[in-house]
Amino acid sequence: DERHDRRISETLEVRGAQLRFEGKSQRKPLDLLKALIALGGRDVPAHVLIELLWPEPLEDGGQKALEITVHRLRRLLLSDDAVRVTDRRVTLDATLAWVDAWTLERMLAALVGTGGAPEPAIEGLEAAAARMFELYGGEFLAGEPEAPWLIPIRNRIAGRFQRIVLRLGAHW
């Protein structure tokens, strides 16, 4: 399976094997992955990532540092196609990288869109609730220091999760 897995619980699995990271060698690629996920993962402007990851001014404006870090992240994910850079925009390929936070957000958005509890199939609702609880392991990237770019996704996921839990509770 060519899918990669980035979990809220701070683990990274590549082709089913959990990776362990020691030292600083993988810090920037992992920071890039976290930032990409937090910013939606699709067409994230390179300058935004550069400002987040290298707040201190760099000679070339950070472009070379970003290129090197993208290359290192691709190696880490075992796929040159997992991260694309087109027209100074960076994308994490969702067909190659499965992100539990994105799956959870889609699930929560769908449940919010149906009023939180689709009536036709209670067993389907129970399965959706079980999956939602499985995916939501707590605050998004809870072990990370408070960063301005993490706050929106943390609040969005937590808020939607709380609203859905309250709505689901009303049905049981």
Regions found by a protein language model. Give the residues of each.
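Short acidic, hydrophobic short linear motifs in intrinsically disordered regions
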Residues: 43-51
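Low-complexity basic/metal-binding stretches
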Residues: 1-7
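Conserved catalytic core of two-component sensor histidine kinases
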Residues: 67
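Intrinsically disordered, charged and Pro/Gly-enriched terminal/linker segments
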Residues: 21-30, 35-42, 54-64, 82-172
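C-terminal flanking helix
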Residues: 70, 74-81
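Residue-level signal for inorganic ion chemistry
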Residues: 49, 73, 132
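Generic beta-strand structural signal
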Residues: 7-8, 85
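Short, Lys/Arg-enriched N-terminal segment that forms or immediately precedes the first helix
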Residues: 8-21
